[in-house]
UniProtKB/Swiss-Prot annotation:
Entry keyword annotation includes Heme: no
Catalytic activity field: a 3'-end 3'-phospho-ribonucleotide-RNA + a 5'-end dephospho-ribonucleoside-RNA + GTP = a ribonucleotidyl-ribonucleotide-RNA + GMP + diphosphate; a 3'-end 2',3'-cyclophospho-ribonucleotide-RNA + a 5'-end dephospho-ribonucleoside-RNA + GTP + H2O = a ribonucleotidyl-ribonucleotide-RNA + GMP + diphosphate + H(+)
Comment on bound cofactor: Binds 2 manganese ions per subunit.
Annotated binding of GMP, by residue: 226-230, 353-354, 402-405, 409, 428-431, 504
PANTHER family in alphabetical order: RNA-SPLICING LIGASE RTCB HOMOLOG
Organism of derivation: Danio rerio (Zebrafish)
Chain positions recorded as Mn(2+) 2 binding sites: C122, H259, H353
Record-listed E.C. numbers: 6.5.1.8
Name listed for the protein in its UniProt record: RNA-splicing ligase RtcB homolog
A single MF term (Gene Ontology): RNA ligase (GTP) activity
Length: 505
């Protein structure tokens, strides 16, 4: 029997102005509470979605995000609480922007591919340059075209970096080390990647031949959807010290942001795992509230196979972003007739938005080894954390938050408070407010392109029809999302970037 909206509200408590609690009983079998972070405008969206669901209206066939956060709180082995970040929106199984951690010592604890997502290690990399907006404006169109020519974009796009089957096997195992060996990356790029660009538990044998077949031609390609390469300008510096450590010292400095993932390969790894896990659930009698939350015990063969395959797909995504960095450096050096080195095109940082990782965290005063699922959320470790690079030991880990086409992006830093409240996790971007289908119905792609042109943004798009799905109107306001995290203390604002050119699939 479904409850009325007013009945549902009995299970929701406001903890403080940026955080709500979802009490046990909101959905059946909750082992821990849920929480979600919002500010006033975002809160309205969340409750509106719940109200619509109570009336029988869904969002693209998914449950409302609040219900999804609750269902995750019912998964075996979850600790502390199921957490929704301010950009949370309905997704497959887990909401996108929902993170959860599972106790590795608990033999029943599970891993769920829906808690990582289909685009494994979809993530963002930020490069700096020593160019100014004044240097780029006169050649902006030329530069956008040069990037578009260098980086293969679009749904079925094929890579330009030569790769045979043996190369792919090695790339899946080695991640950025492969790019380094092949001359597509600089040694210091690796230092500035989450996991140093290589997940060591990766096993290419756990990636099906179908997945490899999909991945082989796509390496070094941008893909479609919300993936982009963007030329950006520093618009605001909130923390001078952190910005300087990142090599950003003034407004108007030019940066490049690359947002992409594991393409068809990661999608296939997730699909294969879901099939295997449905069987494992029957065998081990694991029950879940929503069949999209298919999962397997971490210690089971299916659980281990998925984690090894996921790590390989993660490595593929890091190689992919490295390849695109190589192509971006080439494009810039061609337009400015100088070397990428002379342009100071260093990687500030590279973060993952969709991944599950084994980490040490304090839970109820005890140190525990946890499998942390981050889907549409970003690791944000505090200063002095052993897993972040030397350069950022005093600032905290840089967190890259991509806006949507034509809106600002942000660089944040991790905090100690985030470590205790959210397992060192913060938001990842704007988060959808309209489903893709709805965006296509409501928006006209020419209007979207014209609006970008009016804002002085050069744009190159491989599939204009997909532009509406990515229009700023389809998303929550990224500034609301970032400010919520900042005010809640789970990450702090360092830099704001605005786009001057966008290359999209």
């Amino acid at each position: 029997m479904s409850r009325s909206y007013n009945d549902e509200l009995q299970y929701l408590d406001k903890i403080h102005k940026n955080c709500w609690r979802i009490k046990k009983g909101f959905v059946p079998n909750m082992l821990v509470e849920g929480v979600f972070y919002v500010n006033d405008p975002l809160e309205k969206l969340m409750f509106e979605e719940l109200r619509n669901a109570c009336r029988g209206g869904g969002f693209g066939g998914f449950l409302p995000a609040m219900k999804q956060i609750g269902n995750v709180a019912a998964l075996p082995g979850i600790v502390h609480r199921s957490i929704g970040l301010p950009d949370v929106h309905s997704g497959y199984g887990f909401a996108i922007g929902n993170m959860a951690a599972f106790d590795m010592e608990n033999p029943d604890a599970v891993v769920s591919p829906g808690g990582v997502g289909f685009d494994i290690n979809c993530g963002v990399r930020l490069l700096r340059t020593n160019l100014d907006e004044g240097d780029v404006q006169p050649v902006k169109e030329q530069l956008a075209q040069s990037l578009f020519d260098h980086i293969p974009v679009g749904v079925g796009s094929k890579g330009v970096i030569p790769m045979g089957a043996k190369d792919l096997e090695e790339a899946l195992e080695m991640g950025v080390d492969w790019s380094l060996r092949e001359g597509y990356a600089w040694a210091e790029d690796k230092e500035h990647c989450e996991e140093y660009g290589r997940m060591l538990q990766a096993d290419p044998n756990k990636v099906s031949s179908k997945a490899k077949k999909r991945g082989l031609p796509q390496l070094g390609t941008l893909g479609a959807g919300n993936h982009y390469a963007e030329i950006q300008v520093v618009d605001e510096i909130y923390n001078d010290y952190a910005a300087k450590k990142m090599g950003i010292d003034h407004k108007g400095q030019v940066c490049v942001m690359i947002h992409s993932g594991s393409r068809g390969l990661g999608h296939q790894v997730a699909t294969d795992a879901l099939v295997a896990m449905e069987k494992a659930m029957k065998r081990d009698r694991i029950t879940v509230n929503d069949r999209q939350l298919a999962c397997a015990r971490i210690t089971s063969e299916e659980g281990q196979d998925y984690l090894k395959g996921m790590a390989a797909a993660g490595n593929y995504a890091w190689v992919n972003r490295s390849s695109m960095t190589f192509l971006t450096r080439q494009a810039f050096s061609k337009v400015f007739s100088t070397t990428p080195d002379d342009l100071d095109m260093h990687v500030i940082y590279d973060v993952s938005h969709n991944i599950a990782k084994v980490e040490e965290h304090m839970v109820d005063g005890r140190q525990k080894t946890l499998l942390v699922h981050r889907k549409g959320s970003t690791r944000a470790f505090p200063p002095h954390h052993p897993l972040i690079p030397v350069d950022y030991q005093l600032t905290g880990q840089p967190v890259l938050i991509g806006g949507t086409m034509g809106t600002c992006s942000y660089v944040l830093t991790g905090t100690e408070q985030g470590m205790t409240e959210t397992f060192g996790t913060t938001c990842h971007g704007a988060g959808r407010a309209l489903s893709r289908a709805k965006s296509r119905r409501n928006l006209d792609f020419q209007d979207v392109l014209d609006k970008l042109a009016d804002m002085g943004i050069a744009i190159r798009v491989a599939s204009p029809k997909l532009v509406m799905e990515e229009a700023p109107e389809s998303y929550k306001n990224v500034t609301d999302v970032v400010n919520t995290c900042h005010d809640a203390g789970i990450s702090k604002k360092a830099i704001k970037l605005r786009p001057i050119a966008v290359i999209k699939g």
